[in-house]
Swiss-Prot record:
Transmembrane segments: none annotated. The keyword Nuclease does not apply. This is Methylated-DNA--protein-cysteine methyltransferase. The lineage of its organism: Archaea, Methanobacteriati, Methanobacteriota, Thermococci, Thermococcales. This enzyme catalyzes only one turnover and therefore is not strictly catalytic. According to one definition, an enzyme is a biocatalyst that acts repeatedly and over many reaction cycles. Pfam families: DNA_binding_1, MGMT_N.
Length: 174
């Protein structure tokens, strides 16, 4: 199922889309409805490629409100973890997502290298897991930055900057 809702955040429209079946299978967001729908199609294709059964039949859900509450800091990321299905996620990716969500709190960032060191893996492996994160906002991949600057973000640099600034992050260099 798919739930889509528009919220106002800091004078901006934020469209949140959640694919779910029992629990959250994937999340996306965008500044426009059209952009969100394109991202949802891409997310559904990604999930299906990982053998996740996805339906894009629209159905209202409290999951969009849950993601919004995490986005604005009303609910801690970690508290939303039980709502994620982790379907189609590898054991390594799940370990990265859970560690990041539990240890890198709102208003802080971590470098790819520091995250890799904490998990005893390589920065490249961490970067790959961040790129494949189907749960942005709840699993705060936007808080992972490069030593030289903001780094990459699958949904776009403008979106990453927006999220970091919303959380009060002023500097994002390691």
């Amino acid at each position: 199922m798919l739930a889509v809702e528009r919220f106002g955040v800091n004078g901006r429209d934020i469209w949140i889309g959640v694919i779910f079946h029992g629990r959250i299978q994937g999340i996306s967001f965008a500044f426009t409805r059209g952009e969100l729908l394109e991202r949802i199609r891409n997310l559904a294709e990604f999930l299906r490629g990982r053998d996740v059964r996805v339906s894009l039949d629209v159905q209202p859900s409290n999951y969009t409100e849950l993601v919004y509450r995490v986005l604005i800091g009303e609910l801690e990321n970690e508290k939303a973890l039980p709502e994620l299905s982790f379907e189609g996620v590898t054991p390594f990716e799940r370990r990265v997502y859970e560690w990041l969500t539990k240890n890198v709190k709102r208003g802080t960032v971590i470098t790819y290298g520091s995250l890799a060191k904490a998990l005893e893996t390589s920065p490249r492996a961490v970067g790959g897991a961040m790129k494949r994160n189907p749960y942005p906002i709840i699993v705060p991949c936007h808080r992972v930055v490069s030593r030289e600057g903001i780094g990459h973000y699958n949904l776009g640099i403008e979106e990453k900057k927006f999220l970091l600034e919303l959380e009060g992050v002023k500097e994002w260099t390691g």
